[in-house]
């Protein structure tokens, strides 16, 4: 008998930071990144930047959770409060959040672990 698939969700957050405050953004993001990646249900977290538009970042998080958990449990974690408070001072516009449920099975999944060899 096959195991019941675990729910999985991908969270994509677009942030538009004042280009003069990028270093401050990275500094205030580190404690949040460390807290999120320490969560047992977090399976992936990467930050991307838009090379054509300074100050635009995309955070991509993958979770072994469903959207209900993300909206009713995860977003209420205490470590987000100081992060969001600090962000208000440097964002040029409100952040945008998109949630996606993972396709079932592994037909549409691949991970090249060699790309992450420097991770502890």
From Swiss-Prot:
The lineage of its organism: Eukaryota, Fungi, Dikarya, Ascomycota, Pezizomycotina. The keyword Transit peptide does not apply. Induction: The expression of the dibenzodioxocinones biosynthesis cluster is positively regulated by the transcription factor dibT. InterPro entries: ABM_dom (IPR007138), Dimeric_a/b-barrel (IPR011008). Keywords: Monooxygenase, Oxidoreductase. The keyword GTP-binding does not apply. It comes from the Eukaryota. This is Putative monooxygenase GME11364. GO terms for molecular function: monooxygenase activity. Pathway: Secondary metabolite biosynthesis. Putative monooxygenase; part of the gene cluster that mediates the biosynthesis of dibenzodioxocinones such as pestalotiollide B, a novel class of inhibitors against cholesterol ester transfer protein (CEPT). The biosynthesis initiates from condensation of acetate and malonate units catalyzed by the non-reducing PKS pks8/GME11356. Pks8/GME11356 lacks a thioesterase (TE) domain, which is important to the cyclizing of the third ring of atrochrysone carboxylic acid, and the esterase GME11355 might play the role of TE and catalyzes the cyclization reaction of the C ring. Residues 9-99 form the ABM domain. Pfam families: ABM (PF03992). SUPFAM superfamilies: Dimeric alpha+beta barrel. Its EC number is 1.-.-.-. Belongs to the LsrG family. It is an enzyme of class 1 (oxidoreductase).
């Amino acid at each position: 008998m096959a195991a019941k698939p675990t729910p999985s969700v991908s969270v994509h957050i677009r942030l538009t930071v004042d280009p003069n405050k990028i270093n401050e953004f990275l500094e205030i993001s580190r404690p949040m990144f460390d807290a999120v990646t320490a969560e047992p249900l977090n399976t992936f977290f990467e930050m991307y930047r838009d090379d054509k538009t300074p100050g635009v970042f995309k955070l991509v998080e993958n979770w072994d959770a469903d959207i209900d958990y993300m909206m009713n449990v995860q977003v209420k974690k205490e470590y987000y409060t100081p992060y969001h408070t600090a962000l208000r001072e440097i964002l040029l516009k409100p952040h945008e959040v998109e949630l996606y449920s993972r396709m079932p099975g592994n037909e549409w999944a691949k991970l090249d672990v060699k790309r992450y060899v420097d991770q502890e």
